[in-house]
Amino acid sequence: TGVQTCALPIYPSRVTRQTVSEFVGSLTRDKLSPASTARCLSAVRGFFRFLSQERLIRTSPVTDVTVPRRWLRLPKTLTADEVDRLLRVAAGKMPEDLRDAAMLELLYATGLRVSELVGLEQAQVNLAVGYVLVRGKGDKQRVVPMGEPARRKLDAYLEEARPVLLKKRTAPKMFVTRRGGGLTRQGFWKLLRVRARQASIAKSISPHMLRHSFATHLLDHGADLRSVQAMLGHADIATTQIYTHVERARLKQLHRERFPRKARRLRRRNP
């Protein structure tokens, strides 16, 4: 795969807000995807934040520049009911059932990336206090609470399923197969699709959809944006702000479907 280059054509000290806006516009004209455009803007914003912190420039010209709303691709999420159905399907007592139940519950409870989930090691999980130490992008670490339901599912998996899957072998990875190795990203994608079908979820589901659902449902229930940013491991809060657009879009759709005056016309009274 190629490396995407995000570069402004002049010296940083001469960059203005208009320069950055024109740069973002050029990315669109070059037919860069909305996600790639947002990533480029995030990289530029981080660079100028660094220059500002080092006092090499007075103010960042990127602070108020955003990707136009029409470019944003809203993340797809599951409803609360769909999540409940998905988390209930792996209710069996087979080792794989207990493992799948623990993985699904933990993924939704923490908003981990799939790579972070399958790469999780036992030493990173503290069941006593209910926290996970996550190694994210760029080897950055963050601590994320898991909640009681996920803690119980993990405890059951560790006590009843993991020893059976490993037999007498040892493995550093938390989630393992009967061969003794760690479950791969592809393996988790496969089991997620199987469990989604069992839960009668018609959507094309992906692990990242559970991460999106985690963030969206937290914000729906009053969580503040900075806390969600910290739990997701986003370097730039602009990345987290996309979830506020999801809530606005949902409310707009709800209003369109449920507002009682949607199909009525106001009648003018005769003077």
Listing of model-derived features with the role each one plays in the protein:
Residues 1-5:
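Positively charged, low-complexity/disordered segments
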Residues 7-271:
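Conserved catalytic core of the tyrosine transesterase superfamily
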